[in-house]
């Protein structure tokens, strides 16, 4: 008698927004895969589509709503999760439901179990005798949506700050730090799985453990405080045997950050800090209600460079914030020239529904905001170009991201100064030695021979 083979249900997934949302998507897919669901790369090939949305700025809202519409048109069965799922429309009801009433379910961010329940309701899980007996078939690290050689490690969720331009706390809640043992176990599993670069992310990495009063956890039989310094020390120790990188993102410039600079200076973790400064003028920072707004950031950056001359600092800024005067904006330009931020991005301020900054008097015309953003980026690019030119002639370690024909025709990679997707790259020319090969996910030494925009040109050695 022929058995009727059960059709394996297939899930489509679109992940929009920041790396923190990406880690939520990875967790959802890991749990679904552990239950026997398969994934589809197309809407048409899926039995159901999950859209993980972003709702931070208006452009992100539009992109998320458009993507939901595309998924509905192509597939018809759509579950929505993420930050936009927590957003209300003009009449107070759920915005996604207003715009797309036919979606199957809507949840807010980091609502993994609610998404799982919605999937089970609309696409019952398959019975797989093997998977059913394996409670964690994909290991601690789970499924990753990044290339195999790098991964994001989320250490906390939410944020305790109430910056006037930001609505993330209203969508993701207050700070909740992951247990330090869980974080370190995931890190080790990722390294064991071949990850060569770990990118530590959260809404506020410097505040890790504040919510639990830095309580002591345990990992590998040893006590470890739930605090940024101890976490970074442990990550560096775990990474060392694998020759892997640890890169820190979203690090607010608190005095405690000084404690991790020796770890960077001695090579335990990458000498790279992603510090969201947003502005330099004290009055603008006060209107933004930025944490650490009273800190002397210029002095702090100078001290960091004294402690670790190789440090690369990335930051983001807002131009044209409500009430920003020309003098306040010039203060920001002077700060950029003096601080010499290695990698900088800038947004022209735009009103975000639900943000208290909307009530601050002095909204600037769009043309002024865009013009200031352009002026800022001209200064930032000049600083970056000068910094990049200083690397010409140096030999650097490069993590290979792309290497067709074993790299004999060249490829692309990144140095310690380049985070994936947001910074420049190292464009690798064909090696001088015919015997030299390169593989994706491996390190190579390369001599910097030129600069092209935000990128370096290098010859593998």
Curated annotation (Swiss-Prot):
Gene designation per UniProt: rimO
Main location: cytoplasm
Compartment(s) where it occurs, according to its Swiss-Prot or TrEMBL record: Cytoplasm
Catalytic function, reaction form: L-aspartate(89)-[ribosomal protein uS12]-hydrogen + (sulfur carrier)-SH + AH2 + 2 S-adenosyl-L-methionine = 3-methylsulfanyl-L-aspartate(89)-[ribosomal protein uS12]-hydrogen + (sulfur carrier)-H + 5'-deoxyadenosine + L-methionine + A + S-adenosyl-L-homocysteine + 2 H(+)
Domain MTTase N-terminal residues, every copy: 9-124
Enzyme nomenclature, EC number: 2.8.4.4
UniProt entry keywords in alphabetical sequence: 4Fe-4S, Cytoplasm, Iron, Iron-sulfur, Metal-binding, S-adenosyl-L-methionine, Transferase
SUPFAM superfamilies xrefs: Radical SAM enzymes
Cofactor requirement: [4Fe-4S] cluster
Residues at which [4Fe-4S] cluster 1 binds: 18, 54, 83
Pfam families to which the protein is assigned, alphabetical: Radical_SAM, TRAM_2, UPF0004
Name this polypeptide is given: Ribosomal protein uS12 methylthiotransferase RimO
Family, per entry: Belongs to the methylthiotransferase family. RimO subfamily.
Protein residues bound to [4Fe-4S] cluster 2: 159, 163, 166
